[in-house]
Structure formats: structure tokens, C-alpha cells
């Protein structure tokens, strides 16, 4: 079965740079390892994949993750510690579970764990399907 939901993790976040080159392990890579370590035990691991991303352009708000799926909002969260506790990792997975359960992926502020309440960077609308675009154009044109 192919996962239809994705947790993206920026692996450039929290990098140290010397002479224009990245040195050592980034905060994002550490965060990714923590999520991957708990992922096999997560009940939704067949519904989500964890995808490393080279840069998500939120450098001032590292570390960054996002939840994305077809026909759903995409959420971008920042200000996450790379050294997540097991409870914080569980909070991210619980929030992803709420995202999975909601048809449009809506995540009300009060239902998010603390790090994902104050670290919200964006809620991006789903890309309209061709059918939705044609329907909207028909309403505009009539």
C-alpha cells in the first residue's frame, strides 16, 4: 500500500556552516532521526511516509516539518527542537493523526500539541483539482 500522506522534515535546518559548507549533522537531520526511530511503532505508519527535504526556506524558524496530502491543506510548523523528547515525538504523530482523520486536513489550534500551536508558519490551501477549477470557471463565466 502506498502512503497518501507525508510528513516532510527539513534536513538543512539548524545547520552549522564554515567556509560556505555545511559541517556536521544538522538539527533537521537529528529531528528526522528521532521521528524515524518512533515511526515503525506508530499506528499510522502505513498511511504516512516521512520524507526528508533539503530546504524548506524557513531558516529563521528551524527546525521545520510539514504535513501534506492531496486535496488537503498543507501545514508548515517551525521552531521545533531537534532533540525532541519521546512525548514531543508522540505529539507530532498525534497531530498528524488528526490531520489524517479530517477530510480537509484541518488542525484547530486547540487540538495541536504545544510545539505545533506556537510554531505554525503556514496553512496552505489544497491545489484545486481540474474538476474544481472547471466548476469555478463555469460559475465565473455564467
Predicted regions and their residues:
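Local cysteine-cluster metal-coordination motifs and their immediate loop/turn environment
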Residues: 6-21, 51-69
Amino acid at each position: 500500500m502506498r502512503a497518501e500522506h507525508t510528513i516532510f522534515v527539513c534536513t538543512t535546518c539548524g545547520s552549522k556552516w564554515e567556509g560556505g559548507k555545511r559541517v556536521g549533522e544538522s538539527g533537521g537531520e537529528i529531528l528526522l532521526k528521532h521521528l524515524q526511530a518512533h515511526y515503525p511503532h506508530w499506528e499510522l505508519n502505513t498511511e504516512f511516509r516521512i520524507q526528508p527535504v533539503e530546504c524548506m526556506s524557513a531558516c529563521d524558524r528551524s527546525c521545520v516539518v510539514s504535513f501534506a496530502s492531496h486535496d488537503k491543506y498543507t501545514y508548515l510548523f517551525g521552531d521545533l527542537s531537534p532533540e525532541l523528547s519521546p512525548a514531543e515525538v508522540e505529539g507530532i504523530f498525534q497531530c498528524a493523526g488528526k490531520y489524517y482523520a479530517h477530510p480537509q486536513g484541518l488542525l484547530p489550534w486547540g487540538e495541536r500539541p504545544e510545539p505545533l500551536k506556537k510554531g505554525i508558519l503556514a496553512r496552505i490551501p489544497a491545489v484545486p483539482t481540474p474538476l474544481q477549477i472547471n466548476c469555478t470557471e463555469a460559475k465565473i463565466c455564467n
